[in-house]
């Protein structure tokens, strides 16, 4: 078949340009990425060969070979893994076939350092070769296809690439990098070995290079025909923890996740009992850009007796821990396990429970530590992954109490947007007579902290949690109490902030009686908007506020459902008015513009809690009319 020239997918062109300019300062990663791809290709061959051993083609010893040619100025990475067909080469090397691509490009800022971290999260893989090469040649043949169906793919990393069919006896893939003019320092056995040992020492396959020895007669290093293995070539998780350095754990994480940054923390142990498995689990430092994308691929790499089975085995982790990276190697599962079998397997259920408990323990160790560095780590974790962890309150009944202790919130105690207050912190600071944990929900911290509902709490020195994440209202339907203390919205039902003395009771009853006719008339004026109108003594500075009855949907949750395009019942709140406020005191049931004042008090309260007016034009018209009337009176 003749050579065919094709254009890169638009996103590939953009990624290549960004990557070459943003990642050059860390150019060594090209070799890590290409070796990682070669390792994946070997894993895939092992997996497919479980059903069809003929794919080994009498060459079962899998390996990766790295070589260089000073005269040609090339570096070559060769593997005898699964290889690619023509269609696979075009798809894998010419397009980015993954979710979240649009979100990724939308988050790029132009700041080289920040963009480099983001590109690392996205995963550059094969394209990293263009950081050091101005041309890349790939020759490959998929295992099981005839030698006549080899493929050559070549590109200068600009707008297009060429593909042609070739004769190739060996299965697998050979990638040749034609180096840029200023990259000659890479053409050294010592340099390449040092990069391999730095980034890929843990790769389970042997990485081979030709031995070099000093030739005294030539006064130079001479390449021998003999191979040497330049990495440890054993799966990191199978080694004893005492034999693994922190640096090796970090490098394995980067190999596993394609993240250029170090992990926040990790745990490594072997579990024995009903199910036997080894787990090496990492919590990243930063959330991936597509964490909240419905198609986000989460989960762990699953191995059975060191044989790779699948990426993203989401059955091993609950969705609220989808940020965790790592490896689980089972001794009990069958080698031909499928995703369908995983869903029904008792062994998998036991592994999932064990992995979940291990991750929660890892987070608890950070959250409960007296060490300042660990405290900072947990604060960083919460900032990145707190919203995701909160989902566990509704999804994981068995671990709900453990997750509740890990939650962090903003609070009137700290009066900052930082979410640093735990429920245990709140309970420890409760007033002697206080029986409930109070909270307010709002779209933003500013809206929460300025809520009229907080006025009486500030006056009495009672702490209120400020909940501003979209998931908060949902999780509170599952988290109704903590350590025997009910959670109570300050915008629901009647509040009991302590017993009143006889004098206070009598005074409030007297005021209620005085305002009874006015309140009845307000109910009539607002019958289409408000479920009820009543006096309140919870306000100190605001004339009015909206509350919902216990068990009814709040205005915040209704707005959230609407924003998500879901059906939400109509919102008919209770309007509470402050009899001590001048606006309420000045209301007269027989005044000509009484109805307008009632609607204004309702609309103001709605705006104060972050709600949207159904008819903004009428609100403006009504407000102007009332201002004009007051101006004329003056």
Curated annotation (Swiss-Prot):
It comes from the Bacteria. PANTHER family: HEAT SHOCK PROTEIN 90 FAMILY MEMBER. Keywords: ATP-binding, Chaperone, Cytoplasm, Nucleotide-binding, Stress response. The lineage of its organism: Bacteria, Pseudomonadati, Pseudomonadota, Betaproteobacteria, Burkholderiales. The keyword ATP-binding applies. Belongs to the heat shock protein 90 family. Transmembrane segments: none annotated. PROSITE patterns: HSP90 (PS00298). InterPro entries: HATPase_C_sf, Heat_shock_protein_90_CS, HSP90_C, Hsp90_fam, Hsp90_N, Ribosomal_Su5_D2-typ_SF. It is found in: Cytoplasm. This is Chaperone protein HtpG. GO terms for cellular component: cytoplasm.
